[in-house]
Every structure is written in C-alpha cells, then in structure tokens.
Amino acid sequence: MPTFPTTTSSWDNLLNALARSSIWNWLQAMFIGETTSAPQPTNLGILDNLAPAVQIILGISFLTLLAIGLFALWKRSIRSIQKIVMFVITLYQLYKKGSDFFQVLLANPEGSGRQIQDNNNIFLSLGLQEKILKKLQMVENKVRDLEGIIVARKPASKRDCSSEPYCSCSDCQSPLPTSGFTS
C-alpha cells in the first residue's frame, strides 16, 4: 500500500484560512504567503458592530426588491424575458455598488478611499473629454469640407435680380423690396 505524504500543514492552512474574518486575508495567505495566526484587530467602533446588520439589510432589501420587480413583470406579461433579465442585472449592480461602498467604508473609515475613486473618475472624465474633443474636431473638419463644396458649386457670376420684384437668390446684394411697412 503506497504511503501518502502528510498533508497536515495544508489542512492546518485551510482551517486557519477558513477561520479568518475576511476573504481578503485568506487570499493574502494563499497567494502572498502571509500567515498570521490571529486576525488583526480593528478599531472601527460602532461601524464594526453595524457591519453584519447592514449587510443583512442590504441582502434582504435586494431580495425583496427582486421579488417585487419579478412579480410586477410577471403579472404584466411573460413574453418579455429580456426586461426581466435587465431588471435583475440592474438590481444586482445596485446591490454590488452599495455593498462595495460599504466595504470601502469598513476598510477605511476616514474616507480616503473615496478620494482614490474620485481620482479614477477624473481620469475617466479626462479620457471622455479627449474623445469628445476628437469627435468635435472631426465634425469641424467635415463642416469645412462642406463649406468648400458649397463655395465651389456657387456660380462665379452674380445674377441680375433688379428685374425681379422679390429676389430669393442667396447672392443678391440688394435689399428686398418691402410692402410699405418698415421696422
């Protein structure tokens, strides 16, 4: 009968990882190799005590809104599966954003994590502004080209509009006759 190598150290690592308070600590222990026997103490005060309750409230509200929305869509019509799927995806994204915001708040209660997110939004905004500027420059070039085409098609000689009572041509330099009323 073959003998298997002892794997008590990997079982111990697995049990230690399962005993940790967050998945982040477990990921650090597995991939980076940090092994701390006790979780690091945090001093979050009331936020530390409210974290499980808020996450449960977020989960319950997500499931409640999901049930209400699905019931409303089902009562209305079953033919639109795409609307139901879009509703579920949107609701899940809202839940994830709320949960992520709460996790950032738990990780850094001073609020500097929000500043990092704002910096990312600034870079995103700058990239979007660059794209808009390029599109505007492209439109401006097309307008110039169209103006050139219009000028090229315009007749070189001006028409004599003096014989017509009301001139409707665009290259007439004389003012239009009025009906006696002046403004």
Curated annotation (Swiss-Prot):
Disulfide bonds: none
Topology of this chain in the membrane: Single-pass membrane protein
Keyword Transmembrane appears in the UniProt entry: yes
UniProt subcellular location: Membrane
Coiled coil feature spans: 127-150
Pfam family, one: TMCCDC2
InterPro entries cross-referenced by the UniProt entry: TMCCDC2
Segments passing through the bilayer: 54-74
Protein name (database record): Transmembrane and coiled-coil domain-containing protein 2
Species: Mus musculus
Gene designation: Tmco2
